[in-house]
Amino acid sequence: MDSPAGYRIHDNIPLPGNLDQVDVHVTRDDDYRIHVLPDVDRAVDALLTELDGRRAVVITDDVVADLHEGRVSAELAARGQLIGRTAIRAGEKSKSLTTAFELIDWLAEVNLARRDVVIALGGGVVVDTVGFVASAYMRGVPYVNMPTTLLAQVDAGIGGKVAVDHSEAKNLVGAFYQPKAVISCLEHLRTLDTRQIRSGLAEVVKKAVIASPELFDYIEANADDLLACASPAIDVLVHAAGAIKTKLVGRDPYEIDLRRPLNFGHTTGHAVETVTNYGPVLHGEAVAFGMVVAVDVARARGLVVPEVADRVTALIRRLGLPVALEELGAVPRVDDVVAALLKIRQIRDGSLRFVLPVELGATVIAEDVTEEEVRAALVRLR
């Protein structure tokens, strides 16, 4: 069933047994721990342990600042460890070089030293942007991710890929730079709206399709509880997603092999985000639609088991995520999405790589997907 221009990857990662922490092995110098904790008290305790007396700055956004930042900064200030705190404007448009340079200017103003720590408290935009800033300032200073959205806890805050967007493409300017620790507080998820929860669930569905049939079954069986962000379902999900991503990233932490199954849904998803100018479509929504496109291409090629194709699309729909162009927040034209994909191909050395599902836990990395195939899929999914 494999595409002649691709290779097949099998995975069957079980749900983790340890629901307190995940240890991440990258290299000898880059290992770190992911803490998944039920409440703010334990999250702050974990942060203080990881800081080990070092001073820190807190960078968040103007929404999270009102919800969660006060407690973190107050605890640091009480111990004489707070250098300063600042907030960027919430939203994808802040994930830019302009914001990054403004933050670097601020770090210089507060005299952040090489041994000091940068704390990224927020969603995907914050952890991506702040991680990039930490990688660049003084050739790299330590940072701790405290992701506050589901998407950041299950994906963006883990793995050490830090970047900002560019008008030409999403995540065009970035680095591989691992955090000192990741501290996820499940209590923070209670403040999210349903759309943000759905966006985060898209990234977990991605991991389930490519690497964990057991997790896919779990999401199907617990979809309503997950949408309600109810325990214990959401707790299991965050732990499982972190464990699965770290295992996959650990095999190729610096993307020496760019053909990775974690990019399932992201080829078209990034094109949609670029076309809609990083505004009305959330990242998880774009990835969800990108997965549906990949499933459609795989079905047209006769690669994917039909039952699996139906289950994946049905689960995405059940979670309230887009399965058609018209269901996106801003409806891009087929021609515009194709044009963005062709630009991505130019940036990525001429190959339009698609991760195509074969069955749950098995994917083909295809490097020969044509413009015509993608256009036909987009037309079918219009």
UniProtKB/Swiss-Prot annotation:
| Binding positions for Zn(2+) per the UniProt entry | 203, 266, 283
Q: Which residue windows are coiled coil? A: none
What is this enzyme's catalytic activity, as reactions?
A: D-sedoheptulose 7-phosphate = 2-epi-valiolone + phosphate
Cofactor(s) annotated in UniProt: NAD(+); Co(2+); Zn(2+)
Cofactor comment text: Binds 1 divalent metal cation per subunit. Co(2+) is the preferred cofactor.
What CDD domains does the entry give? DHQS
What Pfam families does the record tag this protein with?
Answer: DHQ_synthase, DHQS_C
Q: Which domain of life is it from?
A: Bacteria
Q: What is its EC number?
A: 4.2.3.155
Keywords (A to Z) from UniProt:
Cobalt, Lyase, Metal-binding, NAD, Nucleotide-binding, Zinc
**What SUPFAM superfamilies would the database entry show?**
Dehydroquinate synthase-like
Give a Gene Ontology cellular component term annotated to this protein.
Answer: cytoplasm
Q: Which annotated residues bind NAD(+)?
A: 92-95, 124-128, 148-149, 161, 170, 188-191
Q: Name one GO molecular function term.
A: nucleotide binding
Q: Name one GO biological process term.
A: aromatic amino acid family biosynthetic process
Which Gene3D superfamilies did the record assign?
3.40.50.1970, Dehydroquinate synthase-like - alpha domain (1.20.1090.10)
The family this protein is said to belong to: Belongs to the sugar phosphate cyclases superfamily. EVS family.
Sum up the protein's function in the record's words. Catalyzes the conversion of sedoheptulose 7-phosphate to 2-epi-valiolone, which may serve as an alternative precursor for aminocyclitol biosynthesis.
Task: Extract the PANTHER family matched here.
Answer: 3-DEHYDROQUINATE SYNTHASE (PTHR43622:SF1)
Q: Which NCBIfam families match?
A: aroB
Q: What is this protein called?
A: 2-epi-valiolone synthase
Q: Which species does the entry assign this protein to? A: Actinosynnema mirum (strain ATCC 29888 / DSM 43827 / JCM 3225 / NBRC 14064 / NCIMB 13271 / NRRL B-12336 / IMRU 3971 / 101)
